[in-house]
Amino acid sequence: MDYVYLDYAASAPMRKEALDAEKTYEASPIAGVNPNSLHSLGRQAARELDGARGVIARAVGGKFRAPDVVFCSGGTEGNNLSVLGMAEGIRNKDHKRNTVVFSAIEHDSILDLAPVLREKGFEVRIAHPNRQGKIEASALEGLLDQSVALVSVMYANNETGVIQPVVDLAHTAHKVGALFHTDAVQAFGRIPLEVEDVDALTIAAHKIGGPLGIGAVLMRSKVPFKAQSYGGGQEAGRRHGTQDVRSALAFAAAAAWCLENLTQTQESVSARANKVYETLCASPKIRPTTEAYAGKDHMPGTVSIMVPSMDSETLILKLDQAGFEVSAGSACSSGSLDASHVLSAMGISRNEALGSLRITFDERVSEADLDTFCATLLQIVG
């Protein structure tokens, strides 16, 4: 059976450009060479690694520079590194700053840091979204005071696709002297990022057609930071361990492709997603999780729906048998199909949330395949 893969928000298939970059590296004299070595090949590998940093910094924009790019293993490590390292770094500089603010719709790699931070003596406050899944600046303001060290709100939600007002949120955090981090894993490479006022952000290669196992934190040089690992002093002392040059080059190749083709792909994928929404939600048995899908504040290629009369697991298995690969939400927590914490935070009932589906794709999924998917799901729902 030929499968139609519709789980790009979990991980996107590798792009040809990224695969070609890996092949070029493997055939080069620096294949397997440690970029921290002082000999000629080591220095050459280091130059290639720094070149990849520059490409990624340009793709992100926001006046980030190559030295701001800290390579890591992916989004989860990047979020851990950013939040823990920045919170402790800020508090070491100003002991009054012992509060961290998250939103209730963050990825588990952020939310699961709450007990860790509390053990370290921080207070953790949670900002809640409105019914459409957006964190408004007004919801943040009531949580902020001079004790806040760091605010972390994701750029775009990994389940609903709702884009957050990051510019306003960063300004709000800065008014009380707090720094602002955003998890941009779902947004990077798919929409233009407005991050001039963001102090740090997290991205991951495998969401944009790069390899699994590599991501990056982009952090301004002025940001106070306490390293969360110890060893060889790599990544300017912010993340220790020998870097994976092969994956960094493939990451950069995917990022460069996304930057070059961003406008065209955003328009075409948005049009396809809107058609999927309109087709599916014409059924009285299917509802969108948020009305934001029709506007500019929604990720292209993310379709988030609910089928209250059925559970997600049944829907996923029936679609899988028909050759369509979708998910119920974040792949990092999909081993247990309980009601989504994101949808619950939006005020959606548990019964409705248990019937949620996430369909995600980019320009490589054809309109014909999406039409067939819609017809198949409508037949399953009845």
Tell where the protein language model's regions lie, with residue ranges:
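Pyridoxal 5′-phosphate
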Residues: 1-382
